[in-house]
């Protein structure tokens, strides 16, 4: 069985406080050592005293760490073994972890350019773009391994970073921290602090600034705290205001289901000026054909959870329905049901297509960790209103004025005009704004 250590000052440490990490099939995979709140606070204090490092040295270490993450054996774990374990504990198809290896390698090599583009054009002569603090805390998620690429930007900008890993995936940040240390990053600049909720709160309290991923309840609890950047549900949407052909359907299917539908940028609502029922039926037929397979199967495209948890997620969908019709259910009647047991007590979450008859149905704000999309009618007279509150909004339309309205709406964080394939892979594209906007500030400078 694996061991997930507390990692401080470049040393992997055990703890008296531990818990077992199980795979989605219920089999124990690792012992996770926990850093209690007091240790978390002490670690942050020690990190403040870590020696400064030059930016070019940090960027070189980051680039090398990306290569090591993708190619090296770290802590006795090969890249392929990492992918196998990551998929088993997170429930995300193994292909996602395999893609993340290459993505992390490529993105780490671009970090210098990525953070440079985030600085204001005026920074330089009469202004300086400087850090708001020195230690950055990260309360990480478990939905997708590539989310850890975000906090690497903080290292590039000169922050020491302490990561509290997500409960279902501590293996990705552990591999990344090991890669950073092997690449030569100063040991006091990076820590891995698995721990309970109290330790996460202690990290947010002790760090200068923090990035927290969480639910709507987490967003509400931390709203107004200018030291914490919260990334909650994405509620990403697509407007179809063009004739629907195979190319449009292909794009919709990819946006809904890519990476198992677990990303916050996966589409959860589709609005159309055309026949919404016909569009929903077409999506249901395509999505229902996606196979339920064990996550370690190379053909797997759907997430897997423990059976009871998967059933609970489907129950949550039914509670949100409020008259919406699930057009995929009939496809599953003779095919294992919408929650399909694939391995021991592990069950694949089959897609759902919910058809509603109005653009303000409350279910349209529902976001679940599998391919689940709500399809609704939309008319031009409704404007941006139903499309607002979106991490990403794709507009399949020739209406240039509507695109301008979307760009001006503060609740829409990314606007995509037309079928932009795999747009979420662009490391230069802001994700809910630039992280640098939160970590840095402009200060005036004048000298004789």
Task: Tell where the protein language model's regions lie, with residue ranges.
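A generic structural motif
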Residues: 191-194, 231-232, 293-304, 397-398, ...
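N-terminal Rossmann-like NAD(P)+-binding subdomain of aldehyde/semialdehyde dehydrogenases
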Residues: 1-127, 289
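Conserved C-terminal structural/oligomerization subdomain of aldehyde/semialdehyde dehydrogenase
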Residues: 22-34, 53-70, 254-258, 272-273, ...
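Short, well-ordered alpha-helix to beta-strand connector turns
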Residues: 206-207, 225-226, 267, 390-391, ...
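Generic non-transmembrane alpha-helical segments
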Residues: 61-72, 175, 179-184, 249-250, ...
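ALDH superfamily catalytic-core signature
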Residues: 182, 209, 219-350, 355-356
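Rossmann-like NAD(P) dinucleotide-binding subdomain of oxidoreductase/dehydrogenase enzymes
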Residues: 113-254, 417, 428, 432, ...
């Amino acid at each position: 069985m694996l061991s997930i250590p507390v990692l401080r000052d470049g040393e992997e440490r055990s703890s008296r406080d531990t818990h077992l990490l199980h795979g989605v099939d219920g089999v124990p995979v690792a012992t996770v050592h926990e850093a209690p709140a007091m240790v978390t606070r002490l670690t942050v204090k020690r990190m403040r005293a870590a020696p400064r490092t030059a930016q070019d040295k940090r960027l070189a270490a980051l680039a090398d760490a990306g290569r090591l993450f993708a190619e090296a054996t770290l802590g006795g774990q090969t890249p392929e073994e990492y992918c196998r374990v990551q998929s088993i504990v997170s429930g995300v198809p193994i292909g996602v972890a395999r893609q993340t290896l290459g993505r992390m390698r490529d993105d780490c090599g671009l970090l210098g350019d990525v953070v440079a583009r985030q600085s204001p054009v005026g920074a330089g002569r009469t202004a300086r773009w400087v850090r708001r603090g020195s230690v950055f805390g990260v309360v990480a998620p478990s939905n997708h391994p590539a989310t850890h690429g975000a906090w690497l930007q903080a290292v590039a900008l000169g922050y020491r970073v302490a990561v509290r890993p997500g409960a279902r995936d501590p293996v990705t940040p552990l591999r990344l921290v090991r890669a950073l240390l092997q690449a030569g990053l100063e040991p006091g600049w990076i820590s891995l602090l698995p721990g309970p909720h109290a330790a996460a709160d202690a990290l947010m309290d002790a760090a200068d600034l923090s990035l927290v991923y969480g639910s709507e309840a987490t967003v509400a609890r931390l709203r107004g705290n200018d030291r914490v950047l919260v990334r909650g549900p994405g509620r990403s949407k697509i407007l179809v205001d063009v004739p629907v052909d195979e190319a449009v359907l292909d794009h919709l299917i990819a946006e809904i289901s890519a990476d198992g539908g677990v990303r916050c940028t996966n589409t959860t609502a589709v609005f159309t000026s055309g026949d919404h029922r016909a569009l929903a039926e077409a999506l249901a037929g395509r999505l229902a054909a996606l196979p339920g397979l064990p996550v370690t199967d190379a053909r797997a495209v759907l997430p897997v959870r423990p059976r009871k948890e998967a059933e609970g997620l489907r129950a949550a969908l039914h509670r949100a329905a409020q008259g919406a019709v699930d057009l995929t259910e009939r496809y599953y009647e003779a095919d294992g049901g919408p929650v399909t047991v694939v391995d021991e007590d592990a069950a694949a979450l089959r897609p759902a297509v919910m058809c509603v008859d109005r653009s303000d149905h409350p279910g349209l704000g529902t976001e679940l960790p599998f391919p689940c999309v709500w399809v609704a009618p939309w008319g031009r007279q409704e404007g941006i209103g139903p499309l607002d509150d979106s991490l990403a909004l794709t507009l399949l339309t020739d209406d240039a004025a509507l695109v301008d309205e979307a760009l001006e709406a503060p609740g829409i964080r990314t606007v995509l005009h037309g079928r932009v394939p795999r747009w979420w892979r662009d490391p230069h594209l802001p994700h809910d704004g630039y992280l640098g906007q939160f970590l840095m500030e402009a200060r005036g400078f004048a000298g004789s």
